[in-house]
Amino acid sequence: MSYNITSSNQYQYFAAMWAEPTAMLNQCVSALSQSYQTQAARDTVRQQFSNLLSAIVTPNQRFPETGYRMYINSAVLKPLYESLMKSFDTRNRIIETEEESRPSASEVANATQRVDDATVAIRSQIQLLLNELSNGHGLMNRAEFEVLLPWATAPAT
């Protein structure tokens, strides 16, 4: 028994693009209360989001029988998740100085504004993702999944 793959675009469902909905919702809520003043803090939270994703099906392993799973590659969630991941990466854009060891007052002010802008962008993207998850977008159960990718059972003998 296996999934009946009839199109090359169906392989995307076997990738590590799935998350437990409650875990992702909890991560969003937790991340909204975090401080993003350092790149290390942004990297940590980005990694926490990334760690929630896993592969839940293979060509021979069926979608879980109960519950829903979040598919991050859905049309609604993919652009939000990608924007969130990009908003965490402010390395080499926060402080740009003539002399790294002695930034001027205007360079420090500019860097402070960039950190604030990055924090606003991160929180905004998290809130957008949280809103869509709360509305049930990108969630699938076995029945919905198997409409997209039918499970082929062995013929009865």
Curated annotation (Swiss-Prot):
**Alphabetic keyword roster:** Acetylation, Capsid protein, Helical capsid protein, Virion
Please give the InterPro entries that the UniProt record associates with this protein: TMV-like_coat, TMV-like_coat_sf
- What's the superkingdom here? Viruses
Leader peptide range in chain numbering: none
N-acetylserine-modified residues are where? Answer: 2
Q: Which GO CC annotations does the UniProt entry carry? A: helical viral capsid
What Pfam families does this protein's entry cite?
A: TMV_coat (PF00721)
**Recorded GO terms, molecular function?**
structural molecule activity
Cellular compartments annotated: Virion
Briefly state the protein's biological role. Capsid protein self-assembles to form rod-shaped virions about 18 nm in diameter with a central canal enclosing the viral genomic RNA.
The text of the family note is: Belongs to the virgaviridae capsid protein family.
What is the name attached to this protein's record? Capsid protein
Organism the protein comes from: Ribgrass mosaic virus (RMV)
